[in-house]
């Protein structure tokens, strides 16, 4: 439940919390869940009177270090996200918009398959980037040092003098 979710995030448990978010409770034959959008309508044409709970925003607010949202119909985006989340050390959330074609698929539902497919817009190309060894630099105040990054590029770091006074 939502209480366990909150505590898992804030305790920074080392886990992937994968949500198949369809905005409905299938066992109750289409009752709106806490993640149902207020503008979304069920099979009977009724809207939920409540604001939806945005699990991704909640996870960020509670301090989760890895938060993503994807669509179950977009394998090219979802697979790299899952790989990255599994490798992440700490709490990772992926909120997967996953339409319930049985109880929450009318045209007015914002979680219907057609609606999500038509409004699915990737914000960026998603790919898995494997972890690398940490790069550190130890240098004196008032000096500059060049640091070579993993891709071979060089970054110049300058440390202000100890007596610097803006």
Language model: regions and residue ranges:
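ATP/pyrophosphate-binding catalytic subdomain of soluble kinases
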Residues: 64-119
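Residues forming the flavin
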Residues: 15, 31, 47
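Short, hinge-like loop/turn segments at secondary-structure boundaries
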Residues: 8, 33-37, 85, 110-113
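Flexible, low-complexity linker and terminal segments
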Residues: 100-166
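Thiamine diphosphate
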Residues: 1-26, 77-80
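Short acidic, glycine/serine/threonine-rich loops at helix termini
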Residues: 1-4, 27-32, 104-109
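Conserved thiamine diphosphate
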Residues: 34-85
């Amino acid at each position: 439940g939502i209480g366990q979710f909150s505590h898992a995030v804030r305790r920074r448990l080392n886990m992937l919390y994968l949500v198949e978010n369809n905005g409905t409770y299938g066992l109750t034959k289409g009752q709106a869940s806490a993640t149902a959008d207020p503008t979304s309508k069920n099979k009977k044409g009724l809207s939920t009177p409540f604001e939806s709970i945005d699990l991704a925003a909640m996870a960020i607010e509670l301090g989760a270090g890895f938060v993503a949202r994807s669509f179950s119909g977009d394998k090219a985006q979802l697979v790299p996200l899952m790989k990255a989340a599994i490798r992440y050390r700490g709490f990772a959330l992926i909120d997967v918009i996953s339409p319930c074609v049985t109880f929450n698929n009318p045209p007015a539902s914002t979680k219907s398959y057609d609606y999500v497919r038509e409004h699915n817009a990737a914000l960026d190309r998603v790919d898995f980037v494997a972890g690398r060894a940490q790069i550190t630099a130890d240098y004196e105040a008032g000096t500059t040092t060049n640091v070579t990054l993993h891709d071979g590029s060089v970054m110049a770091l300058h440390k202000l003098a100890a007596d610097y006074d803006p």
